[in-house]
Amino acid sequence: MGGCVGRPQGESQRSQSRASGQQRKRAGRNEPLKKERPRWKSDYPMTDGQLRSKRDEFWDTAPAFEGRKEIWDALKAAAFAVEANDHELAQAIVDGASITLPHGSLTECYDELGTRYQLPVYCLAPPVNLIMERSEEDGTDALEPAPNTRREFQLKVRLSTGKDVKLNASMVDTIGQLKKQLHAVEGIEPCWQRWFFFWEASHRQNEAPGDEDPERLRDTSYCKPATRDTKLNWHNAQQI
């Protein structure tokens, strides 16, 4: 004859209630947003443009998989505030959206319904091995040679207004350097300058003055645009 041991129903319910309460307590843990931004290193050197593209891809696709769009929008705004070192604004956004941070970081957070949201670290801070890109007109020009090795001459530059300007040039000068020099003389911003060089066919050098054929001149000469880092072929440029 066998026997069994029973457990009072009330005690079982109390035990389940305590376990459920402990679980809700752990899930409801919330800490203030930490001020320290995460430090991380990319697997490969990443440019600023690549980082922006990676972030845009995440923010465009994340709401399509899980969570509510308004929470994603709040997290995006908070992430921008964190990167801008505006900790108070980021905390206000998190609190206003009722977002819970169990570890005080946006890498893991929950909304009011208990839905989990995770932000990759690259959305919160750039990598330590980020490569900064420079625009066409920004950045540092190449170091100039020592004055005793720099051979200068005067270069005539004709503006679109027809005015001729004389600049001090050398064989190693770049267009970026000459643009800055023209800006100092005429006040024309480098970003508004467009430089062109005029080439002529070699047989024109042997023509006597007044013997030029206008039709042939149009066929044997042309203008070529110059970029910021172009070094002039001064043998074809007009020297004074």
Swiss-Prot record:
Residues 153-228 form the Ubiquitin-like domain. PANTHER family: UBIQUITIN DOMAIN CONTAINING 1 PROTEIN-RELATED. SUPFAM superfamilies: Ubiquitin-like (SSF54236). Residues 28-42 have a biased composition (Basic and acidic residues). It comes from Xenopus tropicalis (Western clawed frog). The lineage of its organism: Eukaryota, Metazoa, Chordata, Craniata, Vertebrata. Gene3D superfamilies: Phosphatidylinositol 3-kinase Catalytic Subunit, Chain A, domain 1, Ub domain-containing protein, DC-UbP/UBTD2, N-terminal domain. It holds the Pfam family UBD. This is Ubiquitin domain-containing protein 1. May be involved in the regulation of cellular senescence through a positive feedback loop with TP53. Residues 1-48 are annotated as: Disordered. Residues 12-22 have a biased composition (Low complexity).
